[in-house]
């Protein structure tokens, strides 16, 4: 149910903004100008324990102020959605062992907002705990960088290279849960007895018989232990007292002599397997995460859908004649492209030579030198005439 609500909320957002939204937790963290590493581990640990009570929403993040702190869900294989900040350096990541836990840190320095800042002033750090089943949840922290590490901002070489389009719409979906809270199972049910049976002690078994109820199988209650009972009765009581899930497949012999043989197939059905430990909510959550990662890769690709050609089915291999003809056509096409490239390179070299001659005018000190240089330029211009078609093709 939780995964379905998250998917429906994402589909309610316009298509052009689905790759820009963050799955952010609705937790009002106070501003933190500085955040020590132990505090990061403590926040992520508490968030992993309280995950069934934390609601999330799809929303846009744009130019967060220094000290902002967010808990977000994001697949590790996908890049971070845009947040309005551009960086002059690549994001680096490293691991750190803190209190027996592995903390992965992604640090992006030299951040700036291109519409209002001319120097890099911000740092973004993303943290996540590894090996605790919380790998897709990140703590994102924005803070001010060091003044000595500030450099001039240049949007032409920054990452990401494209500016964000403004104004942005107010996108925020209804809150949803990524993991539903565990439901309380009333004591006395078959599932409750199955879970509590391995932890029962012999004292509890003596005071009250609590054998699980199997379908299509009848068992006799175990009477209380009597010190005057026969050896056979005492042996039957010990078998019932020390019964566990591992030896329940053995037939029990009650004291009255009535034997109930439990079939092996019924016992396997009753005990279940590994998949019985997964709730429908956990299965839906896993499917949603898998599909969300796949759809994010599809939406972020630069390949147009109409240009994707399906593979040919049952295509027979080409003959040697067809392969030879195809190879010949490819070679001719490569020759034409090489000739065109050489022609364009000649135009570029001519332009560079002309530019160098014109730059020599700045070093002229006499009229004689000016006349000599002017003569060189006229001779060079007459020797090389650029066709108009080349100019139009390049423009």
From Swiss-Prot:
- Coiled-coil annotated spans: none
Chief location of this protein within or outside the cell:
cytoplasm
Q: Which organism is it from?
A: Schizosaccharomyces pombe (strain 972 / ATCC 24843) (Fission yeast)
| Descriptive protein name | SWI/SNF and RSC complexes subunit ssr4
* GO BP terms, alphabetized: chromatin remodeling; regulation of transcription by RNA polymerase II; transcription initiation-coupled chromatin remodeling
Q: Which UniProt keywords apply?
A: Chromatin regulator, Cytoplasm, Nucleus, Transcription, Transcription regulation
**What is this protein's function per UniProt?**
Component of the chromatin structure remodeling complex (RSC), which is involved in transcription regulation and nucleosome positioning. Controls particularly membrane and organelle development genes. Part of the SWI/SNF complex, an ATP-dependent chromatin remodeling complex, required for the positive and negative regulation of gene expression of a large number of genes. It changes chromatin structure by altering DNA-histone contacts within a nucleosome, leading eventually to a change in nucleosome position, thus facilitating or repressing binding of gene-specific transcription factors.
Kindly state one GO CC term assigned in the UniProt record. Answer: nucleus
InterPro entries given in the database record: Ssr4_N (IPR013859), SWI-SNF_Ssr4_C (IPR046464)
The protein's matches in Pfam families, at most eight in alphabetical order, are given as: SWI-SNF_Ssr4_C, SWI-SNF_Ssr4_N
């Amino acid at each position: 149910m939780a995964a379905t609500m998250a998917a429906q909320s994402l589909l309610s957002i316009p298509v052009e903004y689905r790759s820009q939204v963050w799955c952010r937790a609705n937790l009002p963290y106070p501003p933190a100008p500085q955040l020590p590493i132990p505090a990061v581990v403590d926040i992520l640990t508490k968030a992993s324990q309280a995950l069934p009570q934390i609601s999330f929403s799809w929303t846009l993040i744009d130019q967060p102020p220094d000290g902002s702190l967010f808990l977000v869900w994001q697949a590790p294989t996908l890049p971070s959605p845009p947040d309005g900040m551009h960086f002059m350096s690549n994001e680096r990541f490293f691991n750190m062992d803190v209190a027996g836990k592995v903390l992965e840190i992604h640090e992006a320095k030299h951040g700036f907002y291109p519409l209002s800042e001319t120097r890099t002033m911000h740092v973004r750090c993303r943290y996540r705990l590894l090996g605790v089943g919380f790998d897709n949840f990140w703590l994102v922290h924005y803070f001010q960088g060091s003044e000595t590490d500030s450099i001039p901002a240049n949007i032409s070489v920054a990452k990401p290279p494209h500016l964000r389009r403004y104004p942005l719409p107010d996108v925020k979906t209804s809150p949803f849960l990524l993991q539903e809270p565990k439901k309380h199972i009333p004591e006395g049910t078959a599932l409750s007895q199955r879970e509590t049976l391995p932890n029962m002690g012999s004292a509890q078994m003596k005071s009250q018989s609590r054998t699980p109820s199997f379908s299509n199988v009848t068992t006799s209650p175990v009477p209380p232990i009597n010190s005057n009972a026969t050896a056979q009765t005492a042996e039957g009581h010990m078998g019932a007292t020390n019964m566990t899930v591992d030896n329940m497949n053995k037939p029990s012999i009650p004291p009255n002599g009535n034997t109930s043989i439990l079939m092996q197939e019924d016992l396997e059905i009753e005990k279940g397997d590994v998949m019985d430990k997964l709730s429908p909510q956990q299965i839906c959550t896993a499917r949603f995460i898998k599909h969300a990662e796949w759809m994010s890769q599809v939406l972020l690709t630069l390949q147009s859908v109409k240009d994707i050609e399906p593979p040919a089915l049952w295509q027979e291999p080409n003959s040697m004649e067809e392969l030879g003809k195809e190879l010949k056509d490819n070679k001719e096409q490569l020759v034409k492209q090489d000739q065109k490239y050489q022609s364009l390179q000649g135009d570029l070299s001519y332009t560079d030579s002309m530019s160098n001659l014109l730059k020599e005018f700045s070093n002229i000190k006499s009229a004689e030198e000016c006349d000599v240089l002017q003569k060189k330029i006229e001779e060079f211009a007459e020797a090389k005439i650029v066709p108009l078609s080349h100019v139009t093709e390049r423009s």
